[in-house]
Amino acid sequence: MVELQVRDATAGDLAAAGAAWSKLQEFHRSLGLAFPLPEDAAQKWLDSFQRTLGRFSFLWVMGPTIQVSAFLLARVKQSPAFLGAVQVGEISDLHVDESLRGSGAGTLLVDAAMHKFQELGMHSVEVQVQAGNDAGLQFWRKQGFHQELALVRKLLKD
């Protein structure tokens, strides 16, 4: 049995994390994700957090460098003033390769994020789950999360 280890991502992990993120988006699109993804979506995703890594965004991975088999991206954000202007942790992306599902890899990644958020004194942590991802919703409930909001969307263009 292979020992699962969570580690901070390095520059050498970014391309593999971007490829894993693309797989995650393919899954989300199969469930009905309404946003179009440009050809360079993975690079734009990486660009969205690289400069804030270690301060307001955190990327943990599993697997050897350049061969990421699981990752979690977490971000720090602030609620609006009318909601107390508190700092909130956001787990924006979690992907575990099919070969590791059921191994506890996802839970280990979530534990790393929760530890960081507790260390930073976050008010709460939120996660968005794509509609139709029942297994994902069940996973988050097992992690102690509960449903608070439901997002609805109407497309204005075809």
Spans of model-derived segments:
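Conserved GNAT-fold acetyl-CoA-binding loop/helix
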Residues: 25-48
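Conserved acetyl-CoA binding element of GNAT-fold acetyltransferases
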Residues: 84-98, 150-153
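Conserved active-site alpha-helix within GNAT-family acetyltransferase domains
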Residues: 107, 131-149
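Conserved GNAT acetyl-CoA-binding A-motif
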Residues: 118-128
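A short helix-loop-beta-strand connector motif used in the catalytic cores of GNAT acetyltransferases and
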Residues: 47-61, 90, 146
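Conserved beta-strand in the GNAT
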Residues: 61, 67-76, 90, 95
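Conserved acetyl-CoA pyrophosphate-binding loop and the N-cap/start of the following alpha-helix
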Residues: 100, 104-112
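Conserved N-terminal entry element of GNAT/NAT acetyltransferase domains
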Residues: 1-15, 158
